[in-house]
């Protein structure tokens, strides 16, 4: 994988999507997440072109990154939304997505939240019959259930969302009963859904999983005499994070899926829509996280201290995930060293990278952490009262702030001290 596809070097300066990283870091400070609208739109275009235009819908899994500016870019390109809960549905509506472009796929929600989602008019992929039963007295017009086809794949155990032991979806026999219950509740319009993995780079997995899923869906359709208005195969389209990984062959992947669709013509009527729900594939490589080296230790091993902690990038600590790191101002430095890249959080797990080889860095140097567009800001926190990163968007030679850096008061706004506990003269936190 060539990580430098999105970078240029002009007059010795490292540019990302046309933006001078050093200059932007000086202007806005670090940690700084820099997004490229051009890359987001190119990723959307690749997905759109890989599938037939008719009876196909691309929905973005907004859990990957819910920044409203990113959502607005996708809305303008005709992309729909895959939402995981009521707040995601409401944000999608607030950013201009019509209800018919939003599908909610919640998991283990309380009844009042499910009812509120239903009241918005968006389509719901019910994770279980128990979830549907919460609204069965007044069911939505269209009902879809999430199937666990017994197949799952993920970069890590925690990101595998199908197969044995997964908390998501229903086995085929339970799904059949769920659709029977929906019919008995007066429902006449149906969809069907699965989501089995995350960051999958092997086209063969999509071949196997969709073949199995289509077979299950076809069986339900035949046994109950129903047709599906949409068949939603979820996401899982991966991007490489390691040097030895190849990019997902999207053409081969889509051909496998379309081949399976042809083999199940009874399932895919002329009015049946295929839906995919990628998140990472659309936004991961659209952003870099810029961090500044703050200090350096060289005792039993080299520790490169930075101003980016696990509160901003949790994936390495949570999953053992790897994010490629390149030096910004030492790009041509021939001297390399091995060490850990660490942050300012009071945890020994606060390591952005372990035992990596990188050009020799000193305090004040900048590094770029790649694939920062997905599951970075959406999983960030204010642990240790550390601020989340500022975010900017590069758009047609202009730059826009799309998230301000946290100030202390921003992090304290929802806390309330009872009057009798306040310090003398204290009027606010």
Predicted regions and their residues:
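A charged N-terminal "starter" segment
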Residues: 1-141, 182-184, 188, 222, ...
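Active-site-proximal loop/turn and secondary-structure-junction residues that shape catalytic pockets
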Residues: 64-66, 87-88, 108-110, 128-130, ...
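Structured core elements
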Residues: 80-82, 103, 123-125, 144-146, ...
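Charged (often Lys/Glu-rich) extended helix/loop segments that serve as interaction or gating elements
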Residues: 25, 271-429
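Glycine-rich, aromatic-flanked loop segments that form ligand/cofactor-binding clefts
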Residues: 140-152
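Conserved, mostly hydrophobic/aromatic
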Residues: 40, 63, 85, 117, ...
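Active-site loop/helix belt of alpha/beta enzymes
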Residues: 2-3, 149-294, 358
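Structural recognition of alpha->loop->beta junctions
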Residues: 74-81, 171-178, 220, 299-300
